[in-house]
């Protein structure tokens, strides 16, 4: 049994922050941000962001394009590291879109989350467990940023992307590879804050609060530039497809310098990489499905083309998927 991508969808907040606006908050400039990251503006909410509502808008967009009712979905997988509820927001998403017949759960793998979620969804379909699965990658990074840290606050934006997949006699997912190295976890993390505590009898119990994102940019850059080309090449080798036979590469939209370095290591022109980083910033788990949806809207991706998706991020985790677009 194969897996077919039925439709895609996306959603972003309706407020953008231009690079120049950061100059009033921190010591930086539009030139510094754009040359080092490729970002020209980020998308942030005017009010308190709702992960669930962003995810629901992307999900409904995908459902509408496929002319499928939410009640017909068997499973929802929400890839996010910033849920509205610490226990997970997939159930809230299920309720929001009215997918009352579906099972729903979250996957937390930061910027690799969508890749892992899509692979997980495909396994359920290939096993014959479910017929239609909705995969959503969504993050509201704005609420976990230290806005005084210029190394990280300029990078992130909020957004959501969705992919609806179903069973088919033809398999659109040709192969995949997933990787993790927990020894590198400290390079990118959002940890529990030990500063708050409460007294319980003779015991002091920490309160459940978290710090802001902390990132070692140099180490993350080295990790991504080294590991991502390897996992892409290995994945392509497994399905007997050469780099030259790939029509498009859609990578996690982290930083333009990372994407340029990966393109160089793969010996491919940057024009083969679909990017939207300059308009949204790093939207974490949303970045790949958001870029995929835009590429389809713009008719860049055509039937029969080979597309490589690759994510990398906190964990540290990374992975790749090879698609044959149908």
UniProtKB/Swiss-Prot annotation:
GO terms for cellular component: chloroplast. Gene3D superfamilies: 3.40.47.10. Pathway: Lipid metabolism; fatty acid biosynthesis. It catalyses: malonyl-[ACP] + acetyl-CoA + H(+) = 3-oxobutanoyl-[ACP] + CO2 + CoA. It is an enzyme of class 2 (transferase). Keywords: Acyltransferase, Chloroplast, Fatty acid biosynthesis, Fatty acid metabolism, Lipid biosynthesis, Lipid metabolism, Multifunctional enzyme, Plastid, Transferase. The active site is at 111, 252, 282. Residues 253-257 are annotated as: ACP-binding. It comes from the Eukaryota. Its EC number is 2.3.1.180. One of its GO terms (molecular function) is beta-ketoacyl-acyl-carrier-protein synthase III activity. Signal peptide: none annotated. The keyword Lipid biosynthesis applies. One of its GO terms (biological process) is fatty acid biosynthetic process. It holds the Pfam family ACP_syn_III. SUPFAM superfamilies: Thiolase-like (SSF53901). Homodimer. Catalyzes the condensation reaction of fatty acid synthesis by the addition to an acyl acceptor of two carbons from malonyl-ACP. Catalyzes the first condensation reaction which initiates fatty acid synthesis and may therefore play a role in governing the total rate of fatty acid production. Possesses both acetoacetyl-ACP synthase and acetyl transacylase activities. Its substrate specificity determines the biosynthesis of branched-chain and/or straight-chain of fatty acids. Belongs to the thiolase-like superfamily. FabH family. The last Arg residue of the ACP-binding site is essential for the weak association between ACP/AcpP and FabH. This is Beta-ketoacyl-[acyl-carrier-protein] synthase III. The gene is fabH.
